[in-house]
């Protein structure tokens, strides 16, 4: 502890060594041996393309990529937001007047700008060379006539986020000075770091915006970890008997992906091995990345846990058994770029397809079948619901059904079967287990489509071996109420 600042030593692997240095320092003098002052600048963020809007909406609000795309599309259809499916983060050079008018309108429309002294410089967001098919996402002037409070909260969040980003991008850079002071004490070296803000710039607007959020998102960037207003250290400055403490730190594994980090990884995938002049790089396009993530979730290869995306056992197994060429981000990125070139008439579609066909033949020849070890990766580890009435195999619960694990058997009971939906009854694993064990299940509060009333009764399994399983509902053994053929 040095005049309110903290100086830290490099990592020490052994606790006894750290304790010995602490004891020595408490009886010694800490002397400042060097002070380095560096002026740094944090440039304003770029405007949103679809992927960056999806990342930020996930980080701040927890929205999935698909939710953000749907919300942006809804705002576009209401003429409140520009076309969302874009990969550009700039406006065209001829949009200067539009951008200036929009920024001025936003200053009076967005609550967090009330009382702010701000003169937007939209020249920073104009560059026709950086615009492909569609320019960056910004609110339209129709917002001036709209009632923000009347919009659904989720749409209002996205519209405000896009408007805030335009104002951030048109603001001054954030500048600050980083001070790095090195101390010697009892033979050990300690480093203190801090910063002094020189100009808040766009971060003042960001601070105002963040203050309006119900839940504060995590901050990123090295400057956020630095102590503000570092003491004015000078070389030769000394501190007698400084306060010293030992802190223990655990290494942490890499964090699981969120949609924000996965979208960023998809955008950058294969970039280091791809031609820097390629028009399209990364996995997917801004318009397709949300659908790719949703398909992984629906297919059971990834599951959502809060904001995190966790690979399932099947997902890990699939990656393990696929040939490396099929899991290469570089290959997919090259295909994406070639498809873009084909769309522009700059590449041969027939030649591209011949290459795909040749690769498919080579893969089939090289990997004619899957090994027993790899097959074992996909063995069912789900609890058995019951025995199949057709073949005696084990029946498991899927996301949408209860199915026989015997691949040669077609027995399946669908959770959304019309029989249960008409009776407003959830087809639970408990009901499924009873049907498989006894051919019947006691169910309370079955709804009668004929009378509009509910009753307690029996659901009977009436499987005839066809494509679909049939059911009957009865109140008693001798009075059948309904039947589905």
What are these regions (language model features)?
Residues 18, 36, 65-66, 84-485:
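Basic, low-complexity terminal or inter-domain segments flanking catalytic cores
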Residues 1-74, 78-80:
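Conserved phosphate-chemistry cores used by DNA topoisomerases
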């Amino acid at each position: 502890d040095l005049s309110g600042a903290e100086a830290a030593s490099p990592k020490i692997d052994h606790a006894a060594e750290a304790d010995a240095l602490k004891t020595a320092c408490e009886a010694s003098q800490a002397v400042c041996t060097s002070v380095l002052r560096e002026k740094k600048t944090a440039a304003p963020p770029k405007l949103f393309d679809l992927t960056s809007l999806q990342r930020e909406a996930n980080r701040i609000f927890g929205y999935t990529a698909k939710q953000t795309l749907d919300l942006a599309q809804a705002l576009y259809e209401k003429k409140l937001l520009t076309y969302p499916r874009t990969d550009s983060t700039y406006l065209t050079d001829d949009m200067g007047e539009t951008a200036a008018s929009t920024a001025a309108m936003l200053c009076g429309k967005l609550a967090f700008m009330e009382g702010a002294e701000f003169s937007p410089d939209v020249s920073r967001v104009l560059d026709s060379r950086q615009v492909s098919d569609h320019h960056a996402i910004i609110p339209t002037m129709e917002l001036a006539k709209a009632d923000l409070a009347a919009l659904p909260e989720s749409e209002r969040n996205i519209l405000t986020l896009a408007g805030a980003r335009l104002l951030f991008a048109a603001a001054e850079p954030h500048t600050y000075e980083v001070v790095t002071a090195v101390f010697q004490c009892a033979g050990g070296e300690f480093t203190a770091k801090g910063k002094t803000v020189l100009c808040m710039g766009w971060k003042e607007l960001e601070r105002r915006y963040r203050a309006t959020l119900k839940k504060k998102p995590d901050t990123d960037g090295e400057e956020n970890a630095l102590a503000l207003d570092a003491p004015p250290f000078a070389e030769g400055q000394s501190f007698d008997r400084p306060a010293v403490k030992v802190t223990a730190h655990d290494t942490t594994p890499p964090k699981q992906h969120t949609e924000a980090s996965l979208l960023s990884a998809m955008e950058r995938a294969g970039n280091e091995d791809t031609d820097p002049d390629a028009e399209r790089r990364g996995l997917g396009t801004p318009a397709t990345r949300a659908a790719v993530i949703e398909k992984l979730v629906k297919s059971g290869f990834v599951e959502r846990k809060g904001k995190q995306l966790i690979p399932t056992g099947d997902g890990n197994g699939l990656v393990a058994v696929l040939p490396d060429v099929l899991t290469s981000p570089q290959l997919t990125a090259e295909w994406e770029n070639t498809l873009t070139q084909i769309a522009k008439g700059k590449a041969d579609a027939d030649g591209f397809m011949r290459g795909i066909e040749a690769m498919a033949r080579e893969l089939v020849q090289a990997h004619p079948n899957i090994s027993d070890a790899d097959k074992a990766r996909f063995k069912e580890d789900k609890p058995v619901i019951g025995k199949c009435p057709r073949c005696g195999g084990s029946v498991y619960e899927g996301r949408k059904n209860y199915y026989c694990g015997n691949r040669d058997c077609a027995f399946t009971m669908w959770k959304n079967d019309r029989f249960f939906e008409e009776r407003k009854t959830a087809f639970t694993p408990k009901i499924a287990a009873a049907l498989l064990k006894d051919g019947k299940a006691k169910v309370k509060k079955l709804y009668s489509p004929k009378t509009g009333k509910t009753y307690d009764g029996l659901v009977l399994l009436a499987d005839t071996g066809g494509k679909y399983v049939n059911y009957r509902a009865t109140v008693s053994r001798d009075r059948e109420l309904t039947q589905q053929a």
